Regions:
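Active-site-adjacent beta->alpha loops and helix N-cap segments on the catalytic face
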Residues: 46, 66-85, 129-147, 161-166, ...
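Hydrophobic faces of well-ordered beta-strands that scaffold small-molecule active sites
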Residues: 36-40, 59-61, 88-92, 124-126, ...
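Glycine-enriched alpha-helix->loop->beta-strand junction motifs that scaffold or abut catalytic
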Residues: 54-59, 84-86, 120-123, 146-150, ...
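Glycine-rich phosphate-binding active-site loops on the catalytic face of alpha/beta enzymes
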Residues: 60-69, 115, 119-131, 176-189, ...
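Alpha-helix-loop-beta-strand connector modules within alpha/beta enzyme cores
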Residues: 69-96, 137-156, 193-215, 260-278
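Catalytic cores of alpha/beta
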Residues: 46-49, 101-112, 162-174, 214-229, ...
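Glycine/small-residue-rich loop that forms an oxyanion/phosphate-binding "nest" at active or ligand-binding sites
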Residues: 75, 80-81, 86-140
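Active-site mouth loops of central-metabolism enzymes
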Residues: 35-43, 92-108, 153-163
Length: 278
């Protein structure tokens, strides 16, 4: 590992803004990844392994993907941080629902960032809005301060904000390295026109990373039509339980769901997306 990357973590040597610039370069160069980067949203250790083996450049680790993702357990974060050859970002979101957080929730999110840093993550994924649908700059600055020199992605809270153009400038001003967005549409493919505008407006000041509904059938097209250089997917398929005894008719919270079938990131799906975007 070169001294530049080592110095990335030395707060006594560089200030936070400079550290985040190094984080941005580190994302691109640390594992000699091609310029087009693939981030996989993973909800378990097995999914993170599948992302690694499938050739993903980075994982966004979270739980509760069915509700858009929430902060994963510290145990899961620590386990995934032991994996070599892939960068690990952690979602900081205390619950599903909107992105207007109470003071107590805000403190939880700040504490979660500190815990993630101590666990050894490479970056965090954050966001927060005001009641009027704008970026909550005061709160998000606190999250950025807690993140220190970590790489920071602003998540899809952006997709439900009031003014996309203004919000992008605010996110850049915060010092975020990356914006995960569907272009304020249900899927990234449907949001291509707005994604194009965001890439043009960003003009290299921040990475625009399309996400939502991304698969091997459309990843390359989304990248080509938007000019984006990174893309985000969950790459999931059905995982069938190995339980021999099954007690039917009892659910654990998911309505009309079979508790013996769930979604996991699939190595072959990750690999298919990766091959399409090379």
């Amino acid at each position: 590992m070169c001294c530049k990357i080592t110095c990335f973590y030395c707060k006594s040597y560089i200030n936070k803004k400079e550290a985040r610039v190094l984080a941005f370069e580190n994302d691109k160069n640390m594992y000699f990844c091609p310029m087009t980067q693939l981030e996989i949203c993973t909800g378990s250790y097995e999914s993170a392994l599948a992302a690694l083996h499938g050739g993903a450049d980075r994982v966004e680790l979270c739980s509760g993907l069915e509700e858009g993702g929430i902060t994963p357990s510290l145990g899961l974060v620590r386990a995934v941080c032991k994996l070599q050859g892939i960068r690990k970002h952690v979602l900081i979101r205390p619950r599903g629902g909107d992105f207007l957080y109470t003071p107590a929730e805000q403190e939880i999110m700040i504490d979660d960032i500190f815990a993630a840093r101590e666990a050894g993550v490479d970056g965090v994924v954050i966001g927060g809005l005001t009641a009027t649908g704008d970026i909550d700059m005061a709160f998000c600055r606190k999250l950025m301060d807690a993140a220190g020199s970590l790489s920071v992605t602003f998540h899809r809270a952006f997709d439900v904000c009031r003014d996309a153009s203004l919000a992008l400038e605010q996110i850049i001003d915060l010092g975020c390295m990356r914006l995960l967005t569907s272009g304020q549409a249900a899927t990234a493919e449907a949001g291509i026109p707005v994604l194009c505008q965001l890439v043009q407006q960003a003009a290299g000041r921040i990475t625009i990373m399309p996400g939502s509904g991304v698969g091997s059938q459309n990843a390359a097209r989304i990248l080509q039509q938007t000019g984006a250089t990174e893309i985000h997917a969950s790459a999931r398929s059905d995982f069938h339980s190995k339980m021999e005894y099954r007690h039917g008719g009892v659910g654990m919270g998911r309505k009309d769901a079979d508790e013996y079938i769930w979604k996991e990131t699939a190595e072959e799906v990750v690999r298919a997306i990766k091959q399409e975007i090379l």
